[in-house]
Every structure is written in C-alpha cells, then in structure tokens.
C-alpha cells in the first residue's frame, strides 16, 4: 500500500496493513500455565497438556497436520490455551482441515477468554476481513483494543492503521501516531516504519525528513525491508539530505535482497541489473 511521492519522484511504501499475516498470524508467546498454588492434580494435568502441545508443535512444524490436529484437540480438551491457539490457526488457514473461519473464531474466543492477547488480535482480524462473520471494523477495533491493553504490539499497530486510514473511525493521524509509537516502543519495526511515513508525508505532523529517516533506520536495523526501500527513496530524491544515487542504490539493493519488489523495480529503473 503505497503513497504518492513528493516532487513526482518514486513512491514509497507504508508497508503491510497488518503486523500479522493474512493467515491470522502465528502463535506468539505462551499463556500462563498452572499457578503455583494449583493442586497436584491440576499441575499434573497442565504438565500433561504442555507435553502434548510440544509433541503437537513438532508434528505441526514437520507438516504432519493430521497428527498435530489430534494432539492439539486432546490438549485443548483439558484447557491448554496454546493448543486452542494452534487449532484456531489451523482452522483459519486450512492446515489439516478444510478452512472454517467459524471454527477458528470458536477456538480463538476460548483462548481469548483465557487471556491470550494474540487470540484477541486474531479475532479482530477475522472481523476486519469479514471471515466467518460480517465484516465489522468497529468490532475489529474493539478486539484490537482488548489485545493492546494486554500488551499485544500487533494490535497496537492495527489500531494505528484504523485511525490512519479511517477504518471504522474518523481519520485521526494524531491517534494513529500515538498507537504506532506505543507499538514501536515495544519493538515493532513495522510501526516504526509507519511513523517514518507519517513524518515523510506530513500526516498529523509537519513534514520532517530527518525524523522520517530516523524512524526508517530503526525499522531497517530490525530487518524491515520496506523501511530499507524508503531510505533509498529519501536518498534518491534528496529529501532532507543531499541527493546521492549511490546511497539510494545501496539501500535498494538491501531491500531487494530481502524480497522487496518496489526496490527491485527501483533498481531496474536506475539501470542496475545485479
């Protein structure tokens, strides 16, 4: 999703809309297990479930989806939240089963009820995309807020996107910036890139190419190839810095090597073939 470039130059990219993949994201983190005060029976049950999930994860990573599904169902039946998350992702992406977003929602809700913030974020994505239920940006925002309040940085970024693009709420760049900064403060490099775009575009703030470069560099240092491309755009266009074609090529090459198609096209337009 790109923005029109200044001075008729090359466009730059705001990056993907979501921090998680369209496939609902991967299992992030692990929910709390049995508390220390749990009874011996409860502790043994939790340990058994964890062992099952570990075996299921091995099967999942090896591509043995049918075996993983059986194991995760057993672990979820005795209350393991990680297993519920895996099941939600499997139903949402069609691994080992036909795609069933309603079933994915059921499992994510169970995990969310147990306090799993990634499940809350994934429920928000289902509402945002209208998968298994009518599309609702408002419901998506509600779930992203729940996840963000539990510390989920992907949800923080998603809230920022909704305010930036006016999805279910009026456009509010200041609020978008606030949420992007929260996510970036927790190490989210996609949010750092998004902040750079706001400064480069002058959305809710004065145009500040130096600040834009600072945020792009933060994101690029974390491996964000969209930010690498955006740095190349600044160098090529001489935006806030002395125009330097060689530096632009350096950054386009870094981004292209990481798979950025915009950077690959930029190199071609500059006559660079390697």
Stretches with model-predicted labels:
Residues 48-74, 78:
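Alpha-helical segment of the N-proximal tetratricopeptide repeat
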Residues 52-59, 71, 84-93, 122-129, ...:
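Hydrophobic face of amphipathic alpha-helices that form TPR/SEL1-like repeat modules
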Residues 39-43, 253-274:
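Terminal, low-structured helical/coil segments at or just beyond the last alpha-helical repeat
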Residues 63-70, 98-107, 134-143, 170-179, ...:
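Structural signature of tandem alpha-helical TPR/SEL1-like repeats
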Residues 16-27:
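Bacterial N-terminal signal peptides
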Residues 1-12:
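N-terminal secretory signal peptides that target proteins for export/translocation
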Residues 47, 60, 77-80, 93-95, ...:
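Short helix-capping/linker turns of helical repeat alpha-solenoids
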Residues 74-75, 110-111, 146-147, 182-183, ...:
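Canonical positions in the second alpha-helix
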């Amino acid at each position: 999703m790109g923005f029109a470039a200044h001075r008729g130059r090359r466009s730059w990219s705001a990056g993907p809309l979501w921090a998680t993949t369209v496939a609902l994201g991967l299992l992030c983190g692990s929910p709390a297990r049995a508390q220390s005060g749990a009874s011996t029976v409860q502790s043994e049950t939790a340990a058994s479930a964890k062992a099952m999930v570990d075996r299921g994860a091995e099967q999942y990573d090896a591509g043995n989806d049918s075996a993983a599904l059986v194991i995760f169902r057993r672990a979820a039946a005795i209350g393991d939240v990680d297993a519920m998350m895996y099941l939600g992702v499997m139903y949402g992406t069609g691994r080992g089963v036909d795609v069933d977003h309603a079933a994915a929602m059921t499992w994510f809700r169970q995990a969310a009820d147990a306090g799993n913030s990634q499940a809350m974020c994934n429920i928000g994505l289902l509402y945002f995309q209208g998968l298994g239920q009518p599309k609702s940006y408002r419901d998506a925002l509600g779930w992203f807020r729940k996840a963000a309040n539990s510390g989920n940085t992907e949800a923080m970024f998603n809230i920022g996107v909704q305010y930036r693009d006016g999805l279910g709420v009026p456009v509010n760049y200041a609020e978008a910036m606030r949420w992007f900064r929260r996510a970036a403060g927790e190490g989210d490099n996609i949010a750092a890139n998004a902040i750079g775009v706001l400064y480069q575009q002058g959305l809710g703030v004065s145009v500040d190419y130096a600040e834009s470069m600072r945020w792009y560099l933060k994101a690029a240092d974390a491996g964000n190839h969209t930010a690498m491309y955006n740095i190349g755009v600044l160098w090529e266009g001489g935006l806030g810095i002395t125009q330097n074609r060689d530096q632009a090529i350096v950054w386009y090459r870094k981004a292209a090597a990481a798979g950025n198609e915009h950077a690959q096209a930029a190199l071609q337009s500059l006559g660079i073939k390697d």
